[in-house]
């Protein structure tokens, strides 16, 4: 009997190991920013922008799969390839841009998580618990797990948090599920009329949904995860299935968040600007249990994205320098410690530094077109890809993604300019 149980556990562990790179990407992608974007879309426009999510997830899968295939064929990560085959400056740009983005994300994510926990604590404690204490708790939790230096332990803990997040948001979907006809109608591309008082046009809301789903950091870190897994072109099917699993779950979770907001706030004619605000709006409509489930999902989303966020910069430095990824080295522990402390900025000062916000917005705007352009260049090189060069159809799809990324870059840079001129 013990032997049988041991075999079952072993098979489960082996099955989990196949999807760990995808789970890492899922945790990285579904954070408080994407939750806010999807919830706002659902609250303001119901499920009419569901097609945007479908298109975003398709683009994300397409890019993840092709970047992963590049690493399977060449054995190189994205930063290695940029440095070696394009120009070292391109690799350095990605290192700086993603590093600044991570710093801004850590501040924002931990600020939102701490605020949500504070709002939640008000329901069972008079005056609640100050956000700083929650931020310190989650920062310490992530850093202690990182300190172990064991990638497998880290990945399994992340898988547990992602599973909790998925369960919470799926439960919310079934609690607030819109009519099936509404879901089907949302798959038909259309732009609804702007909602009075929304503050954002449906086009801007759609662009924010794309921006939080089609994220360059996913594609760059994907190559690192594929190389770390030890996969070669012989495991292309496993790599593709892992990417499909990750993006499929990404769609289900994001659609569930939209549906929760559409089935409550949109029907009631209520609007929101932040994830924490949604808790107060939901309670009179759905009750304390539903709010608690949604809050748990939000917290899990924040924590699951915090893990990859603090690891990303050290991993990218290792990639660019060609060094072994040993996170027990003092220099990497110091980098992660400093990045982790940035999570206290918003709870303490109630705002992110304006310089970080501007730089993060600017880099995010231009990095996606560059990521697509680099892939088109590298994956068409016969000397690198041999018989695995991009097909005509793949080049056409990438060209379409590139054009759309230039459009979102224009919107992003316009937002940066507005921020600068309003100072």
Question: Where are the language model's segments positioned?
Answer:
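Transmembrane-helix boundary/entry motifs in multi-pass membrane transporters
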Residues: 8-16, 46, 73-101, 122-123, ...
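Juxtamembrane transmembrane-helix boundary signature
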Residues: 25, 52-83, 93-107, 261
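Transmembrane alpha-helical segments of multi-pass small-molecule transport proteins
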Residues: 121-147, 164-169, 326-345, 368-377
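Hydrophobic alpha-helical segments and their helix-loop junctions in multi-pass secondary transporters
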Residues: 163-194, 206-207, 212-224, 374-383, ...
